[in-house]
């Protein structure tokens, strides 16, 4: 049989097979569409069951809307027993929601439970200019606030007596009311339950002892105050910082008024709301050396030299600025005749230490000369020299060492590649040596920036505990609190005593003058509170 004959016999058989194939394809298409429809129905029913379960067993605080009975039409094709169970669950959920709605709202008015706290202090206030011959006591209004003393929380009751005319037919004296009550003392937080000592403790625990909110809340719970939340504590913190910001602005002006400051910067993680990740931002520190005032400054996390430049321009800073080798300072002030840059000998020394393994003779020579410079400083310290005497001694002994070091670097520096450790150390030191020699000009100037670095360390320690700031505003608030606490440390002021008093006073100083606020900064405040000055121990 030829090939053509075989094909002629097969062709009649192909047509029925093609028809069957087309029919099966149509069936598959219909079944696929039906399956997709059923899957969609299952998702809808699953969502409805989950919604009903949340109403019945979930948290009521989500305030979900009451179930619309019309939504149950989706269950029309279900088995009767399943539909009946869902309907019963719906009725039970609606009933429970209705019963608990009002009750829950009432309970939420004050979630913080203070019943276990003792009442240790009562302040009874009587109206001014009270004529007891005309008025009689008719009641009192009691305000309860939570105060703190180390190891204990307690209630302070502010009792305001209410007095009314003895005789209803009497007329109150001119300018007075028929019912008298003492005015409510101003509190740090309007209608808040947190007293000044509790608020100061929250600030101290967070930025002096580096304790995050959740640990504080656990501690306060152990002391008898239940139901505190991180959002509540953070709200108290923010309102307290708002009270302190006028003080912070005065402190900033006082620091920048000085003619000798040290500056440094450190990183602080700040949460980015868009990426939900903590970004590395920068916090600046400026320290007025002679006045021992400390300022932390946050400007959207920038490390650009423009930050410190704008700060100096705003307050018309004139004087010496001592800093590490960060190029941003030099860029910011190289054209400013009012700012004389002084660098840090410790940073120079560190670079030579790093070169010890590579080129010990060269590195040891540089380190030995730097050691001689510090021996001269120790000699001046031991002799208790005044700034003028120190300046004279430096010019007698230190200047020739500094000049010899510069000549040595000019001669030896060209022999080593900038890629070598010793080459890097010489380049780093030489490019900053003229600025470094300025410490010979004034006996007040220090050879290094160590004091500034010491102010940064508490920030570093805190970073390991509270981890990050929630946003830029939180970082600015941190700068406010840390500035006041650092200044307290520099003046040996008890920070708890200081904050207790200042937070109590600030509600009365919302319109205070610059000079009035200046008297509330730690270095001035301690003059009228000698009992709060801590004695240094050796």
Features from the language model and the residues they span:
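Short, flexible loop/hinge motifs at secondary-structure junctions
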Residues: 1-193, 234, 262-263, 397-398, ...
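Catalytic center-proximal scaffold of phosphoryl-transfer enzymes
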Residues: 22, 127, 162-164, 169-538
């Amino acid at each position: 049989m030829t090939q053509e004959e075989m094909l002629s016999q097969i062709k009649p058989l192909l047509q029925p097979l093609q028809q069957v194939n087309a029919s099966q394809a149509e069936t598959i298409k219909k079944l696929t569409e039906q399956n997709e429809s059923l899957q969609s129905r299952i998702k809808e029913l699953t969502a409805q069951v989950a919604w009903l379960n949340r109403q019945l067993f979930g948290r009521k605080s989500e305030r979900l809307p009451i179930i619309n009975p019309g939504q149950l039409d989706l269950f029309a094709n279900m088995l009767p027993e399943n539909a009946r169970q869902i309907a019963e669950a719906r009725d039970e959920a609606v009933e429970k929601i209705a019963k608990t709605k009002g009750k829950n709202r009432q309970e939420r008015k004050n979630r913080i439970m203070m019943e276990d706290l003792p009442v240790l202090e009562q302040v009874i206030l009587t109206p001014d200019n009270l004529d007891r011959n005309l008025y009689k006591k008719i009641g009192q209004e009691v305000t309860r606030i939570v105060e703190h003393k180390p190891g204990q929380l307690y209630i302070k009751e502010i009792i305001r007596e209410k007095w009314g005319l003895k005789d209803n037919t009497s007329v109150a004296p001119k300018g007075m009311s028929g019912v008298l009550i003492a005015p409510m003392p101003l509190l740090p937080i309007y209608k808040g339950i947190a007293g000044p000592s509790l608020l100061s403790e929250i600030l101290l625990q967070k930025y002096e002892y580096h304790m995050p909110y959740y640990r504080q809340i656990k501690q306060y719970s152990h002391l008898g105050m239940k139901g505190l939340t991180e959002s509540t504590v953070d709200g108290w913190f923010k309102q307290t910082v708002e009270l302190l910001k006028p003080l912070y602005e005065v402190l900033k002006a006082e620091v920048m008024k000085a003619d000798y400051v040290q500056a440094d910067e450190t990183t602080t993680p700040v949460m980015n709301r868009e990426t939900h990740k903590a970004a590395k931002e920068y916090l600046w520190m400026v320290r007025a050396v002679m006045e021992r005032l400390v300022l932390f400054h946050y400007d959207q996390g920038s490390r650009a030299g423009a930050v410190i430049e704008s700060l100096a321009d705003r307050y018309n800073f004139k004087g010496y600025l001592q800093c590490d080798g960060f190029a941003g300072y030099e860029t910011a002030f190289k054209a400013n005749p009012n700012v004389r840059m002084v660098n840090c000998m410790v940073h120079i020394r560190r670079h030579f230490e790093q070169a010890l393994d590579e080129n010990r003779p060269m590195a040891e020579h540089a380190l030995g000369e730097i050691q001689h410079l510090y021996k001269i400083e120790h000699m001046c310290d031991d002799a208790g020299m005044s700034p003028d005497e120190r300046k004279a001694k430096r010019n007698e002994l230190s200047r020739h060492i500094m000049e010899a070091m510069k000549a040595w670097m000019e001669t030896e520096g060209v022999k080593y590649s900038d890629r070598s450790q010793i080459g890097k150390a010489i380049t780093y030191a030489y490019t900053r040596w003229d600025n470094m020699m300025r410490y010979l000009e004034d006996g007040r100037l220090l050879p290094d920036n160590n004091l500034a670095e010491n102010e940064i360390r508490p920030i570093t320690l805190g970073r390991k505990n509270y981890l990050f700031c929630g946003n830029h505003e939180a970082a600015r608030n941190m700068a406010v609190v840390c500035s006041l606490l650092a200044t307290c440390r520099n003046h040996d002021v008890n920070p708890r005593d200081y904050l207790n008093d200042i937070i109590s006073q600030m509600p009365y100083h919302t319109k205070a003058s610059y000079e009035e606020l200046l008297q509330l900064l730690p270095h001035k405040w301690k003059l009228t509170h000698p009992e709060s000055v801590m004695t240094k121990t050796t």
